[in-house]
């Protein structure tokens, strides 16, 4: 596609149409190198475009839905091409070359999976979620491909050849994207049944989640009830399509967009870092920095359980009275009375993270480990470990904290994959 336009959207001058699909156009942005603009259409299709109808307002709804989805994924730390919304019907994205593979993740067996896997009952639950890949080819109805076929195709995009390492990265990322959105929708008592995503390769050679994620991309069942579905399957199931039917589909899509806008990660938690002395500030700040990187709210206080036990307990009661999701991190060297005293006085989790040094570690850490019976505080040595432990606890009730932890693990996996790929190979003497 090489048509050009002189139009602009929200001050962004549109260049040539890079590609046009059934429901969107992708424009070059000549004044914004490395970026492009995706403009949605008021169009709904199914069956590789065999069924298609105009649907006034769909472009705006789709764009809003997509923006809310990528808001959550970007906040979690997933690497995406999405930059920002641009007007009612468009958004700005990093320019990338798309990998022609559609990644599908399924929590429950339904739809085309049942036709391809005769004998599997509808509603069969996949744990972990089932993953499938399809080669994007409308003429052949997007045939299912194996992992071996993807690797053997040797797609080369922006200088990167898609091999086993890249497939592994996309597979892990796809699964995590599904699980993040699944947990987000659980806060609205909605079950994410399955969804599809695509990836692209940016100019820097990195794999990013790309394209659009909207109500065309998933199956969504409120209260886990298929009869209440609010996704494009409602349109797919129509033998004949009336204006009233299209209005129902549109109302469903609006409902989805409104629910997504209301999914806001909770901030009803606090990690209180209690240090026995102001001299422990450096160690405590490292804990706080790690906590904030995981989306945790933090406060730092100074109180000595040895020199001022009454004040220590007053501080504990102060936070207990205003916060239900609360964790105390005790930072005290030498004889650590702070953590055990707090642990014996509260039902909230207490994590000891003493600022020990290599020359006195075995002596000083013992007071945090050899505790009287009835105390359940944990002990870690490193600031990041204290933050990770706190996040693991709070993530049980906060999907965004849980998501940030999982993304951190994913990024570790990707870093190791890339390092191994770079160093791999036989070295002769």
Swiss-Prot record:
<keyword id="KW-0436">Ligase</keyword>
<dbReference type="InterPro" id="IPR018236">
    <property type="entry name" value="SAICAR_synthetase_CS"/>
</dbReference>
<dbReference type="InterPro" id="IPR050089">
    <property type="entry name" value="SAICAR_synthetase"/>
</dbReference>
<dbReference type="InterPro" id="IPR028923">
    <property type="entry name" value="SAICAR_synt/ADE2_N"/>
</dbReference>
<feature type="region of interest" description="AIR carboxylase">
    <location>
        <begin position="265"/>
        <end position="429"/>
    </location>
</feature>
<keyword id="KW-0067">ATP-binding</keyword>
<feature type="region of interest" description="SAICAR synthetase domain">
    <location>
        <begin position="7"/>
        <end position="264"/>
    </location>
</feature>
<comment type="similarity">
    <text>In the N-terminal section; belongs to the SAICAR synthetase family.</text>
</comment>
<feature type="region of interest" description="SAICAR synthetase">
    <location>
        <begin position="7"/>
        <end position="264"/>
    </location>
</feature>
<comment type="subunit">
    <text>Homooctamer.</text>
</comment>
<keyword id="KW-0456">Lyase</keyword>
<keyword id="KW-0547">Nucleotide-binding</keyword>
<comment type="similarity">
    <text>In the C-terminal section; belongs to the AIR carboxylase family. Class II subfamily.</text>
</comment>
<feature type="binding site">
    <location>
        <position position="335"/>
    </location>
    <ligand>
        <name>CO2</name>
    </ligand>
</feature>
<dbReference type="GO" id="GO:0004639">
    <property type="term" value="F:phosphoribosylaminoimidazolesuccinocarboxamide synthase activity"/>
</dbReference>
<comment type="function">
    <text>Bifunctional phosphoribosylaminoimidazole carboxylase and phosphoribosylaminoimidazole succinocarboxamide synthetase catalyzing two reactions of the de novo purine biosynthetic pathway.</text>
</comment>
<dbReference type="GO" id="GO:0005737">
    <property type="term" value="C:cytoplasm"/>
</dbReference>
<dbReference type="GO" id="GO:0006189">
    <property type="term" value="P:'de novo' IMP biosynthetic process"/>
</dbReference>
<dbReference type="GO" id="GO:0005524">
    <property type="term" value="F:ATP binding"/>
</dbReference>
<dbReference type="GO" id="GO:0004638">
    <property type="term" value="F:phosphoribosylaminoimidazole carboxylase activity"/>
</dbReference>
<dbReference type="InterPro" id="IPR033626">
    <property type="entry name" value="PurE_classII"/>
</dbReference>
<keyword id="KW-0210">Decarboxylase</keyword>
<comment type="pathway">
    <text>Purine metabolism; IMP biosynthesis via de novo pathway; 5-amino-1-(5-phospho-D-ribosyl)imidazole-4-carboxylate from 5-amino-1-(5-phospho-D-ribosyl)imidazole (carboxylase route): step 1/1.</text>
</comment>
<comment type="pathway">
    <text>Purine metabolism; IMP biosynthesis via de novo pathway; 5-amino-1-(5-phospho-D-ribosyl)imidazole-4-carboxamide from 5-amino-1-(5-phospho-D-ribosyl)imidazole-4-carboxylate: step 1/2.</text>
</comment>
<keyword id="KW-0511">Multifunctional enzyme</keyword>
<dbReference type="Pfam" id="PF01259">
    <property type="entry name" value="SAICAR_synt"/>
</dbReference>
<dbReference type="GO" id="GO:0005829">
    <property type="term" value="C:cytosol"/>
</dbReference>
<keyword id="KW-0658">Purine biosynthesis</keyword>
<protein>
    <recommendedName>
        <fullName>Bifunctional phosphoribosylaminoimidazole carboxylase/phosphoribosylaminoimidazole succinocarboxamide synthetase</fullName>
        <ecNumber>6.3.2.6</ecNumber>
        <ecNumber>4.1.1.21</ecNumber>
    </recommendedName>
</protein>
<dbReference type="InterPro" id="IPR000031">
    <property type="entry name" value="PurE_dom"/>
</dbReference>
<dbReference type="Pfam" id="PF00731">
    <property type="entry name" value="AIRC"/>
</dbReference>
<feature type="region of interest" description="AIR carboxylase domain">
    <location>
        <begin position="270"/>
        <end position="429"/>
    </location>
</feature>
């Amino acid at each position: 596609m090489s048509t050009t336009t002189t139009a602009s959207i929200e001050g962004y001058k549109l260049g040539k149409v890079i590609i046009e699909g059934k429901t969107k156009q992708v424009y070059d942005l000549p004044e914004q190198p490395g970026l492009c603009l995706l403009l949605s259409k008021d169009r709904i299709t199914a069956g590789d475009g065999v069924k298609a109808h105009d649907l006034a307002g769909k472009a705006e709804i789709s764009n809003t839905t997509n923006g809310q989805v990528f808001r959550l994924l970007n906040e979690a730390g997933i690497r995406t091409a999405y930059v920002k919304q641009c007007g009612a019907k468009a958004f700005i994205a990093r320019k990338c070359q798309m990998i022609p593979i559609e990644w599908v993740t399924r929590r429950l067996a339904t739809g085309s999976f049942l036709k391809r896997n005769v004998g599997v009952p509808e509603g069969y639950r996949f744990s972990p979620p089932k993953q499938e890949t399809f080669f994007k080819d409308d003429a052949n109805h997007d045939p299912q491909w194996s992992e071996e076929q993807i690797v053997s195709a040797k797609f080369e995009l922006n200088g990167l050849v898609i091999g086993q390492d890249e497939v592994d990265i996309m597979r892990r990322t796809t699964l995590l994207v599904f699980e993040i959105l699944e947990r987000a929708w659980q806060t609205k008592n909605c079950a994410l049944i399955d969804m599809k995503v695509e990836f692209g390769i940016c100019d820097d050679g990195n794999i990013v989640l790309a394209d659009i994620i909207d109500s065309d991309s998933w199956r969504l069942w409120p209260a886990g009830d298929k009869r209440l579905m609010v996704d494009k399957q409602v349109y797919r199931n129509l033998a004949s399509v009336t204006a009233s039917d299209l209005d129902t589909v549109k109302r469903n899509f609006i409902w989805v967009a409104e629910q997504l806008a209301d999914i806001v990660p909770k901030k009803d938690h606090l990690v209180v870092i209690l240090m026995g002395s102001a001299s422990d500030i450096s160690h405590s700040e490292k804990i706080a920095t790690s906590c904030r990187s995981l989306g945790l709210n933090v406060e730092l206080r100074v109180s000595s359980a040895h020199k001022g036990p009454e004040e220590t307990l007053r501080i504990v009661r102060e936070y207990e009275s205003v916060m239900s999701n609360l964790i105390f991190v005790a930072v005290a060297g030498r004889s650590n009375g702070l953590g055990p005293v707090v642990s014996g006085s509260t039902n909230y989790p207490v994590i000891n993270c003493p600022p020990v040094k290599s020359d006195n570690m075995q002596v000083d850490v013992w007071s945090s480990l050899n505790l009287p019976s009835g105390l359940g505080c944990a002990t870690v040595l490193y600031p990041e470990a204290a933050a990770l432990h706190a996040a693991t606890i709070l993530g049980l009730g906060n999907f965004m904290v849980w998501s940030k932890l999982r993304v951190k693990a994913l990024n570790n996996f990707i870093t190791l994959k890339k390092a191994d790929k770079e160093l791999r190979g036989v070295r002769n003497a």
